[in-house]
Curated annotation (Swiss-Prot):
The gene is hisB. It is found in: Cytoplasm. This is Imidazoleglycerol-phosphate dehydratase. Gene3D superfamilies: Imidazole glycerol phosphate dehydratase, domain 1. Its main location: cytoplasm. It catalyses: D-erythro-1-(imidazol-4-yl)glycerol 3-phosphate = 3-(imidazol-4-yl)-2-oxopropyl phosphate + H2O. The lineage of its organism: Bacteria, Bacillati, Cyanobacteriota, Cyanophyceae, Synechococcales. InterPro entries: IGPD_sf, ImidazoleglycerolP_deHydtase, ImidazoleglycerP_deHydtase_CS, Ribosomal_Su5_D2-typ_SF. Keywords: Amino-acid biosynthesis, Cytoplasm, Histidine biosynthesis, Lyase.
Length: 209
């Protein structure tokens, strides 16, 4: 791992009996991406997250994919969420809120999020195919559950249109990337203040504010 140039950076190494996941996220990057999870479709979506969110992203993962992709998919989501939380710190000076509507051909997906420290996922994708290639469509939701619970994001995902499963999921990741980019960017008018009337936004796992 060696492409990081970001000032706000999170590094997580998660090891279990099922997986070994190393994640490095740079919030102030330019979309450099080096990802290898052993789950090809997940890699493709993580590239979308990096490219459209302008996140520098390095991920390596090994897991029990000979059984299925569930553990690797979930543990990558956990580590990505933890790395985002670490990089955001006390969330001082950020815009905090983000939203985007992304099209991909016939698919249209809206994402609205809040870097609130209060994890919540409202998931509204209706993916018609059970699998996209070899990737179980149910794992899309499981990935976002893991990210949300470990990053402290409030995340709403709405599918406005779409019939092609690949298009729906890719539009979702692109919308998430752009909404996240909007939320985590530094707001110069904040002058480094925490974007909350309470004066504090806790990291994931702390007391909610």
């Amino acid at each position: 791992m060696g492409i990081m140039t970001s000032l706000r950076q999170g590094d997580v190494h998660r090891v279990t009996a099922e997986t070994d996941v190393l994640v490095r996220v740079g919030l102030d990057g330019c979309g450099q991406c080096n990802v290898s999870t052993g789950v090809a479709f997940l890699d493709h979506m993580l590239h979308q997250l990096s490219s459209h969110g302008l996140l520098d992203l390095e991920i390596t993962a090994t897991g029990d994919t000979h059984i299925d992709d569930h553990h690797t998919n979930e543990d990558v989501g956990i580590a990505v969420g933890q790395a985002l939380s670490q990089a955001l710190g006390d969330r001082r000076g950020i815009h905090r809120f983000g939203h985007f509507v992304a099209p991909l051909d016939e698919a249209l997906v809206q994402v609205v999020l809040d870097c609130s420290g209060r994890p919540h996922l409202s998931y509204g994708l209706q993916i018609p195919a059970e699998r996209i290639g070899s990737y179980d469509s149910e794992l899309v939701k499981e990935f976002f559950v893991a990210v949300v619970n470990n990053s402290g994001l409030t995340l709403h995902i709405r599918q406005l249109a779409g019939t092609n499963s690949h298009h729906i999921v890719e539009a979702c990741f692109k919308a998430f990337a752009r909404a996240l980019r909007m939320a985590i960017e530094i707001d110069p008018r904040r002058a480094g203040a925490v974007p909350s009337s309470k004066g504090v936004l806790e990291q994931a796992g702390g007391q909610k504010s």
